[in-house]
Curated annotation (Swiss-Prot):
The modification Phosphotyrosine is found at residue 527. One of its GO terms (molecular function) is protein serine kinase activity. It is a single-pass type I membrane protein. The modification Phosphoserine is found at residues 359, 437. It is found in: Cell membrane. InterPro entries: Kinase-like_dom_sf, Leu-rich_rpt, LRR_dom_sf, LRR_N_plant-typ, PRK1-6/SRF4-like, Prot_kinase_dom. This is Pollen receptor-like kinase 1. Residues 32-256 are extracellular. It comes from Arabidopsis thaliana. The modification Phosphothreonine is found at residue 457. ATP binds at residues 363-371, 385.
Length: 662
């Protein structure tokens, strides 16, 4: 071989392996698939809750894993809450999730310094509250995170100054730093925040002028802070006071004049307002055959009327101005989108204007908003649910989650027909259920002169609820509590008393603080004791609902009046024998039913087991409920296990017609 060729071959033999080696070691983590990246991330975790991440395995796609939410097949949210997690957070592994936008590790046991989250530059929401992170957060910890909107670091052990980079985030909307040990002064924020909590730290110095109109509670527990809105402005040792003799005469001389002027102005405004309203009422007065709240009630109560009216006003103004019409209308259309987004293709389409023109009747209101029945001009009846506390996800995440819920199809679910997105509030449009909620049928029928639910109807409702809940657990495996808010007011009844679950799958959307205060899942024993939610949390909700259906007792009454809850009240009165005082008198007299009722009571108590490990899972609960019958069969010997020898009664041939629930 010629020397030149030999040298060339020698160089080739050396360079090719070297280049391959360099390529191997320089391959970034983001070359991994989502599945590989998450499994790599899992290796850095210590999981305290048994089987919490059992679904995380290569045999199934990551979008079906617990706590993993996807958008278009890519992972956009990891919701790892209440799992007793510790160890470290592998940022390099997470950087392989190129579509990741939300991280939540709240209510776990992570320790150590603040992870280098700035490597996840596309992140929009970061929730680390209620852990044990500590130490100073570097000033540049949030540099380059231009998309970050929500930062929740409450109830940790962070020290040092608030990082300057967090105050400079251009899109920041929420910042919770309460319950830490931050020191130094509060930085100037780039713009107004929707949510800010700096309470219970060791902050000092003046409150920035941009925060002078903030609720004082935001700054509670920081003894060294002064300035508006705190009352300690003039008593702070950190500022030099002017002589009080100079300030007081000026204040005292102007005070009465200012107050008089304000009172006079308010009086004039009130008088003008009353005259305007009376005049408008007179002009618009028309006879109607609508429901009691009138045609504009939905507009007023949903807050859409003003936006819609302003749009019409702009159109009129543009029409009068002539040449500027096209430009202004185009601009208005670009800013304001009043179109409903439909999730069901099998329904007759209508638009927001049809809803605004509809006669409306308020059905009820709760912690998250209110519900209205809207009767469209076609005669179609819809329910519009208004949510004001649904800002835990951005527009894209919200729409993707709505599509996921819209794909659910089961005869025991109330389908979401359409939705309307506004930054301030959201509207969900559903079908109208003729008999209203289970809560009304259980607790208000007698006072309204309507018949109570009998045993066969109650059993039918329990079976339907269980089936619907099981379906949710099968089709929403990534949610820790697929329903999350199961209670009697969130079960609606059709004309034939078929139950329909509603308000399911909303935990990822509801503001975290409000969810923890009001949603049913956060009242479970595991959350109250260990600050965690599990797959069996919905089962606990099912158990409480079963006990409510059988006893007629409203669960909320127990938490308000005593430390005892409904499950412990039933347990204290149930000794394995028939106890009429436990059951709702409204069930009346039925035939051959005691054994089946006691079976269901036992299932309900097993679903309410405080120890999560001993509690039934949803599959076991559904299987046992499906075995129940309206009346005893000849082959059923269950009742004998609940009848004491001294009682002497048997379900065989015994008619429940003689049983009184009084």
């Amino acid at each position: 071989m010629p020397p030149m060729q030999a040298r060339t071959l020698s160089v080739y033999n050396v360079m090719v392996p070297l280049v391959c080696l360099l390529l191997f070691f320089s391959t970034p983590t983001h070359g991994l698939s989502d599945s590989e990246a998450i499994l790599k991330f899992k290796e850095s975790l210590v999981v305290g809750q048994e089987n919490a991440l059992a679904s995380w395995n290569a045999k199934s796609p990551p979008c079906t894993w617990s706590g993993v939410l996807c958008n278009g097949g890519s992972v956009w949210r990891l919701q790892m809450e209440n799992l007793e997690l510790s160890g470290s957070i592998d940022i390099e592994a997470l950087s392989g999730l190129t579509s990741l936008r939300t991280l939540s590790f709240m209510n776990n046991k992570f320790e150590g310094p603040f992870p280098d989250f700035k490597k996840l530059a596309a992140l929009k929401s970061l929730y680390l509250s209620n852990n044990q992170f500590g130490g100073d957060i570097p000033g540049d910890a949030f540099e380059g995170m231009g998309w970050l909107k929500k930062v929740h670091l409450a109830q940790n052990k962070f020290t040092g100054q608030i990082p300057s980079s967090v105050a400079k985030l251009p899109k920041l909307l929420e910042l919770r730093l309460d319950g830490n040990q931050f020191t130094g002064e509060i930085p100037e924020f780039e713009h107004q925040l929707h949510l800010l909590n700096l309470s219970n730290n060791a902050l000092t110095g003046p409150i920035p002028e941009s925060l002078s109109m903030t609720d004082p509670k935001v700054f509670e527990g920081n003894k060294g802070l002064y300035g508006k809105p705190l009352e300690t402005e003039c008593d702070s040792p950190y500022i030099e006071h002017p002589p009080q003799s100079e300030a007081r005469p000026k204040s005292s001389s102007r005070g009465p004049l200012v107050i008089t002027a304000i009172v006079a102005a308010l009086t004039i405004l009130i008088i003008l307002g009353v005259i305007f309203l009376l005049n408008r009422s007179y002009k618009n007065k028309k006879p109607r055959l609508a429901v009691e709240t009138g045609p504009s009630s939905l507009q007023k109560k949903t807050g859409i009327r003003e936006a819609d009216q302003s749009r019409r006003d702009r159109k009129k103004a543009d029409h009068r101005k002539g040449s500027g019409t096209t430009k202004r209308m185009g601009a208005a259309a670009g800013v304001e989108n009043t179109k409903l987004s439909f999730l069901r293709e099998d329904r007759e389409k209508f638009d927001l204007q049809d809803l605004l023109k509809a006669s409306a009747e308020i059905l009820g209101s709760g912690c998250f908003g209110a519900s209205y029945k809207a009767v469209l001009s076609s005669g179609q009846m819809m329910v519009v649910k208004r949510f004001k506390q649904m800002n835990n996800a951005g527009r894209d995440e919200f729409q993707e989650h709505m599509k996921r819920l819209g794909r659910l199809m089961h005869h025991n679910l109330l389908s979401i027909v359409a939705y309307y997105y506004r930054k301030e509030e959201k509207l969900l449009v559903c079908d109208f259920a003729e008999r209203g909620s289970l809560a009304i049928n259980l607790h208000s029928n007698q006072s309204l002169g309507k018949p109570s639910l009998d045993w066969p109807t109650r059993l039918k409702i329990v079976k339907g609820v269980a089936k619907g809940l099981f379906y949710l657990h099968q089709d929403l495996p990534s949610l820790m509590a697929p329903h999350g808010h199961l209670k009697s007011s969130n079960v609606l009844l059709t004309k034939t008393f078929e139950p329909l679950l509603t308000d399911y799958g909303l935990i990822p959307l509801i503001n975290q603080e409000k969810a923890q205060m009001h949603m049913a899942a956060y009242r479970s024993p595991e959350y109250l004791q260990h600050r965690r939610i599990t797959k069996k949390t919905d089962v606990w909700g099912l158990g409480i609902l079963i006990l409510e259906i059988l006893t007629g007792k409203f669960p909320a009454n127990f938490s308000q009046s005593s430390e005892e809850d409904l499950a412990s009240w039933v347990n204290s009165g149930f000794h394995g024998v028939w106890a009429p005082s436990l059951f709702d008198k409204g069930m009346g007299k039925t035939s051959h039913c005691e054994g089946q009722i006691l079976k269901l009571l036992t299932i309900g108590l097993n679903c309410c087991e405080p120890d999560v490990e001993k509690r039934l899972d949803i599959g076991q609960a559904v299987e046992k409920i499906e075995e129940l019958k309206e009346r005893e069969g000849d082959d059923d010997d269950f009742y004998s296990t609940y009848v004491s020898e001294t009682d002497g009664r048997s379900s065989k041939g015994e008619s429940c017609e003689s049983i009184s629930f009084a």
